[in-house]
C-alpha cells in the first residue's frame, strides 16, 4: 500500500477478490504489527481475518416498506437469549435466523417474531450485534457474553450466524433477520457500543494509528470514563467519521431503523447530532436515543451528550432514570430495598405526575424521555420487587402489571425488556452479562404459563395506540390517579381505595381500566 494525499494508504488490485481474506502488516520503525481492517464489513471466525465481500449481496435481499412511526414502543432483547433455550420450538437456537422462522407456536401461543408482532411493539432493540470479544464463535455454546466488548463496529457478530467461518453467513443472515421483522411491521434498533473498545492496545484502531482514536489524560494514561479501560475520542475527525460510517452500514446495508447509543454521555453533542442527521437521511422515522449519563470522561461538561445537555440535541432520546426511580424505586445494588410510588413507597403527587406527564422538568420535549422500569442492566423488575417488599407474591404480581401499564400509558417512549411480561427472574443477579443461558434465556414455557399477563401488556400497548398521548394530563384525588387524554380517561389505582371515584369521572361512553385492589 502507498501513502496518498491526506495520509490515506491505498492499493488497487485487479481481479475479482470476492471471498478474499486479508489482514494488515504495519511496519513502524523497527516494529511490525498485524491487525484486521477496522473498516472491513466482515471477517472469519473470532476476528482472525478481514474479508472482502460484495455489499450488493446484502442490499439485494428483498425488504418491505414500513409506514412512518410517530409513537414508538421499544422491546429490548438479546438475539441469543430469545431463542436459545429448549422451550424455543423453532429450528435455529440463538441465531439471527431464528427470528425468520414464521408460524412457531407453543401450546397455541405464537413465538419468535410472531410473538413480538402479537405483542404490538413498534421497535425491537437488540443488544450489540457488532463483532465482540467474549464468545468463541466456533463453539458459542461454551461461553456467554452480552456483547459490550467491541472488536469491530462494522462486522456483525459471528456467534449468531449458522457458519461463523463464512464471512457471508453473518452479513446475509443479519440482513434477513431485519427483513423478517419488517415483514411483521416491526422496526429494529441496534445497541451501538461506540464509546470504547475491548482492549485498547490490541485493538485494530490503535494498531493502525497508535493513540489517535482515544482520549488521554495529562499523565499519559487513557481516559476511563466508560470504566472499561478506555474512551474513544468522538471529537477526532476520523473517530467521528467511523461513527457515521457505522450508521451508513447499519441503515443502508442492513436496513435498521434506529440506534441505542451505549454510554452516550461519553460522546459529544455535536457528534450525536451528526449521527442523528445522517440517520434521518435514510429513514425519516429513525430513532436515536441513548444513555445520557454524566460519565467522568476527558470532555467538557458543556459538550457531553448527557441529559444535562439534552436541549443541545433535538430529537435525541434519553433513558429517564428519574421515571424509573420514582415509579419502582432505586436500582443500584445498594438501593434494592428502596421503594417507588408503585412498589409501596412515599412520593409526592407532584413528583409522580411530573414523570407520568413526560418529565418536562427534565426535558424540553416529552418525546426525549425513554421511560423504563427494567433493562438488561441491574435487577429484573420482579427481583427488585421481591428485594424491597415482603408482600405476598400475588400482590407483587399485581404491582408489576400496574407498573408496566403506568409506563405504557405515560407520555414519552415506553421501553420494555424481554421477560418482564412474565415476571422473569435472574435469581437476584444484578449484572448477568456473562451468567449464561440458564439465567438470561427467554423461557417460552413460562411465557405461555403467564399468558394472561402477557395479554394485559398487549392490551395496554393496543390502548396506547388509540390515545392522544400529547394531550395527557394526570390528576389525583383520594389516592387514585386519572390519566386524561381528552376523549379517553384511564384510572390507575395503586392502593386499596374505593372504585366510586373512578366511576364518577368516566363518561358513559368511556372505558374504565382499573386494578381490583
Go through each PLM region and give its residues.
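Active-site-proximal helices and loops of the catalytic beta/alpha 8
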Residues: 2-3, 141, 147-148, 257, ...
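A cross-domain feature marking catalytic cores of carbohydrate-active enzymes
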Residues: 79, 128, 190-192, 196, ...
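Conserved, mostly hydrophobic/aromatic
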Residues: 24, 77, 126, 153, ...
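Hydrophobic faces of well-ordered beta-strands that scaffold small-molecule active sites
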Residues: 73-75, 124-126, 188-190, 259, ...
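Extracellular/periplasmic catalytic domains that process cell-envelope and extracellular macromolecules
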Residues: 17, 66-71, 117-118, 281-282, ...
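The feature marks proteins involved in alpha-glucan
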Residues: 3-101
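Loop/helix patches that line or flank the sugar-binding groove of alpha-linked glycan CAZymes
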Residues: 366-506, 512
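Substrate-binding/active-site clefts of carbohydrate-active enzymes
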Residues: 80-254, 271-283
Amino acid at each position: 500500500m502507498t501513502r496518498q494525499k491526506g495520509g490515506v494508504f491505498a492499493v488497487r488490485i485487479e481481479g475479482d477478490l470476492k471471498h478474499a481474506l486479508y489482514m494488515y502488516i504495519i511496519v513502524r520503525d523497527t516494529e511490525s504489527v498485524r491487525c484486521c481492517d477496522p473498516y472491513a464489513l466482515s471477517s472469519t471466525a473470532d476476528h482472525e481475518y478481514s474479508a472482502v465481500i460484495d455489499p450488493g449481496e446484502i442490499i439485494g435481499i428483498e425488504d418491505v416498506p414500513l409506514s412512518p412511526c410517530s409513537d414508538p414502543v421499544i422491546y429490548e432483547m438479546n438475539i441469543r437469549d430469545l431463542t436459545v433455550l429448549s422451550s424455543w420450538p423453532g429450528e435455529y437456537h440463538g441465531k439471527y435466523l431464528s427470528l425468520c422462522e414464521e408460524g412457531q407456536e407453543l401450546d397455541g401461543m405464537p413465538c419468535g417474531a410472531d410473538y413480538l408482532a402479537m405483542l404490538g411493539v413498534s421497535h425491537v432493540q437488540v443488544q450489540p450485534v457488532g463483532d465482540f470479544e467474549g464468545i468463541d464463535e466456533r463453539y458459542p455454546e461454551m461461553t456467554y457474553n452480552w456483547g459490550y466488548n467491541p472488536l469491530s463496529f462494522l462486522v456483525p457478530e459471528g456467534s449468531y450466524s449458522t457458519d461463523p467461518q463464512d464471512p457471508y453467513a453473518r452479513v446475509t443472515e443479519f440482513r434477513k433477520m431485519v427483513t423478517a421483522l419488517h415483514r411483521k411491521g416491526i422496526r429494529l434498533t441496534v445497541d451501538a457500543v461506540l464509546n470504547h473498545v475491548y482492549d485498547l492496545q490490541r485493538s485494530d484502531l490503535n494498531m493502525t494509528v497508535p493513540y489517535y482514536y482515544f482520549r488521554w489524560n495529562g499523565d499519559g494514561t487513557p481516559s476511563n470514563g466508560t470504566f472499561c479501560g478506555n474512551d474513544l475520542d468522538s471529537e477526532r475527525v476520523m473517530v467521528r467519521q467511523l461513527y457515521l460510517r457505522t450508521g451508513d452500514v447499519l441503515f443502508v446495508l442492513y436496513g435498521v431503523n434506529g440506534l441505542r447509543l451505549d454510554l452516550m454521555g461519553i460522546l459529544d453533542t455535536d457528534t450525536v447530532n451528526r449521527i442523528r442527521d445522517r440517520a434521518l437521511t435514510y429513514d425519516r422515522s429513525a430513532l436515536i436515543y441513548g444513555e445520557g449519563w454524566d460519565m467522568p470522561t476527558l470532555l467538557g461538561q458543556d459538550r457531553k451528550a448527557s441529559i444535562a445537555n439534552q436541549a443541545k440535541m433535538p430529537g435525541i432520546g434519553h433513558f429517564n432514570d428519574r421515571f424509573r426511580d420514582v415509579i419502582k424505586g432505586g436500582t443500584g445494588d445498594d438501593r434494592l430495598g428502596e421503594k417507588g410510588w408503585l412498589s409501596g413507597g412515599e412520593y409526592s403527587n407532584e413528583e409522580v405526575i411530573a414523570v407520568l406527564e413526560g418529565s418536562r422538568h427534565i426535558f424540553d420535549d416529552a418525546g426525549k424521555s425513554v421511560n423504563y422500569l427494567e433493562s438488561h442492566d441491574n435487577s429484573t423488575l420482579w427481583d427488585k420487587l421481591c428485594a424491597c417488599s415482603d408482600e405476598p407474591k400475588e400482590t407483587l404480581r399485581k404491582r408489576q402489571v400496574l407498573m408496566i401499564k403506568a409506563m405504557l400509558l405515560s407520555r414519552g417512549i415506553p421501553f420494555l425488556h424481554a421477560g418482564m411480561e412474565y415476571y422473569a427472574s435472574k435469581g437476584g443477579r444484578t449484572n448477568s452479562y456473562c451468567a449464561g443461558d440458564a439465567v438470561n434465556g427467554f423461557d417460552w414455557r413460562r411465557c405461555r404459563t403467564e399468558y394472561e399477563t402477557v395479554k394485559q401488556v398487549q392490551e395496554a400497548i393496543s390502548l396506547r395506540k388509540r390515545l392522544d398521548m400529547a394531550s395527557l394530563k394526570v390528576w389525583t384525588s383520594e389516592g387514585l390517579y386519572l390519566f386524561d387524554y381528552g376523549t379517553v380517561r384511564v384510572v390507575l389505582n395503586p392502593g386499596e381505595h374505593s372504585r366510586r371515584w373512578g366511576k364518577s369521572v368516566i363518561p358513559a361512553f368511556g372505558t374504565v381500566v382499573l386494578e381490583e385492589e
